[in-house]
């Protein structure tokens, strides 16, 4: 297997892998510009290869990852108006308190059963380790960064929704901890 890093605005620095036969590897040759050759195939420019190298046998970009990272962007009432944000940020009509959101988010950090914050799948575990969660405002836009060993289905979206309630003053840190402890999803 081989892997490369792809980069675009949304999926910046993602790792992908490509399984090639020995014949395909031979055709690539020892060209020092393998990245350039691959980028010619990716003509739209939305994704490009920055680095390419052989990976250990059995490597899988999805299942061999040490952790996963999401950055969720929210443009609220106090954010600058920008047409560039339309594709990359959730718009929220009221001003959010990102400091309260950050404080409340810390209740979710650590190894927990996140059944309350995801849509469980058959035979799938909802136990995850949320290694980092932060809420900051950068250039007027709220960024929620989550790093975990893995994320359950809809987990990030559900956590972000709960944090928006905190930022709106409709929920507290204690509410987030209480919901987490329930280990049962109460709404869709």
Task: Identify the residue ranges that each predicted region occupies.
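Single conserved hydrophobic/aromatic residue that forms the stacking wall/gate
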Residues: 1-7, 11
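Short, structured active-site "lid" loops
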Residues: 12-37
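A common structural junction motif
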Residues: 40-46, 163-168
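Non-catalytic RNA-recognition surface used by pseudouridine synthases
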Residues: 46-147
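Short amphipathic alpha-helical signal-transduction/dimerization elements
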Residues: 106-109, 160-168
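Conserved helix-adjacent loop modules within structured domains
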Residues: 139, 143-153, 170-174, 178-179
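Pseudouridine synthases involved in rRNA/tRNA modification
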Residues: 163-188
């Amino acid at each position: 297997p081989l892997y490369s890093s792809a980069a675009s605005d949304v999926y910046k620095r993602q790792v992908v892998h490509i399984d090639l036969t020995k014949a395909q590897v031979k055709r690539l040759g020892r060209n020092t510009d393998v990245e350039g050759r691959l980028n010619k195939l990716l003509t739209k420019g939305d994704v490009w290869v920055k680095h390419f190298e052989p990976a250990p046998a059995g490597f899988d970009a999805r299942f061999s990852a040490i952790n996963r990272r999401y950055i969720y962007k929210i443009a609220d009432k106090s954010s600058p108006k920008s047409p560039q944000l339309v594709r990359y940020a959730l718009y929220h009509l009221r001003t959010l308190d990102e400091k309260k959101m950050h404080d409340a988010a810390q209740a979710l950090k650590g190894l927990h059963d996140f059944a309350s914050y995801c849509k469980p799948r058959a035979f799938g575990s909802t136990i995850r380790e949320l290694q980092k969660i932060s809420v900051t405002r950068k250039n007027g836009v709220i960024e929620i960064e989550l790093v975990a060993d893995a994320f359950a289905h809809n987990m990030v979206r559900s956590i972000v929704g709960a944090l928006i309630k905190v930022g709106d003053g409709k929920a507290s840190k204690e509410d987030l901890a209480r919901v987490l402890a329930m280990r049962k999803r109460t709404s869709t």
